[in-house]
UniProtKB/Swiss-Prot annotation:
Gene transcribed to yield this protein: ndk
PROSITE patterns hit by this protein: NDPK, NDPK_LIKE
Subcellular location: Cytoplasm
Cofactor(s), by name: Mg(2+)
Ligand binding (ATP): 9, 57, 85, 91, 102, 112
Name of the protein described by the UniProt record: Nucleoside diphosphate kinase
Family matches, as Gene3D superfamilies: Nucleoside diphosphate kinase-like domain
Keywords noted in UniProt: ATP-binding, Cytoplasm, Kinase, Magnesium, Metal-binding, Nucleotide metabolism, Nucleotide-binding, Phosphoprotein, Transferase
Active-site residues from the entry: 115
Source organism of this protein record: Chlamydia trachomatis serovar D (strain ATCC VR-885 / DSM 19411 / UW-3/Cx)
Family per record: Belongs to the NDK family.
Catalysis performed (reactions): a 2'-deoxyribonucleoside 5'-diphosphate + ATP = a 2'-deoxyribonucleoside 5'-triphosphate + ADP; a ribonucleoside 5'-diphosphate + ATP = a ribonucleoside 5'-triphosphate + ADP
GO biological process: CTP biosynthetic process; GTP biosynthetic process; purine nucleotide metabolic process; pyrimidine nucleotide metabolic process; UTP biosynthetic process
EC number: 2.7.4.6
Length: 141
């Protein structure tokens, strides 16, 4: 059973879209194996997005991710990484498929509602960044 990391970003948390987004995941068959709401520090956001450190949007991304609380989740299910990415839609909400999370709730490339792991390898890294193994409940459903 695959696991992937999902983050509901500050824009969606601030607009009270948490429940709607979780419902999309659950209706697709993904299950929540771990979840918490946190307000990232600068150090945490920089550490999480370190792969983008040399990119021109890095500081803007960090500033956005620390602008309010986020909901961090481990989603579990068959093909969890790919399913989550399909549910999220394209990074740019204007290009995201109709009905996708980013089409429904995203505003721009930078303010795009959710983050999701882009590969199984990165999912493992990202999950361990936020959760200890003891915090993850393997679902039986």
């Amino acid at each position: 059973m695959e696991q992937t990391l999902s983050i509901i970003k500050p824009d969606s948390v601030g607009k009270a879209h948490i429940g709607e987004i979780i419902a999309i995941f659950e209706k697709s068959g993904l299950r929540i194996a771990a979840m918490k709401m946190v307000h990232l520090s600068v150090k945490e956001a920089e550490g999480f997005y370190v792969v983008h450190k040399e990119r021109p949007f890095f500081q803007e991304l960090v500033d956005f991710m620390i602008s309010g609380p986020v909901v961090v989740m481990v989603l579990q299910g068959e093909n969890a990484v790919d399913r989550n990415r399909e549910l999220m839609g394209a990074t740019n909400p204007k290009e995201a498929a109709e009905g996708s999370i980013r089409a429904l709730f995203g505003e721009s490339i930078g303010v795009n509602a959710v983050h999701g792991s882009d590969s199984l390898e990165n999912a493992a890294i990202e999950v361990s960044y936020f959760f200890a193994k003891t915090e993850i409940v393997n679902s039986v459903a």
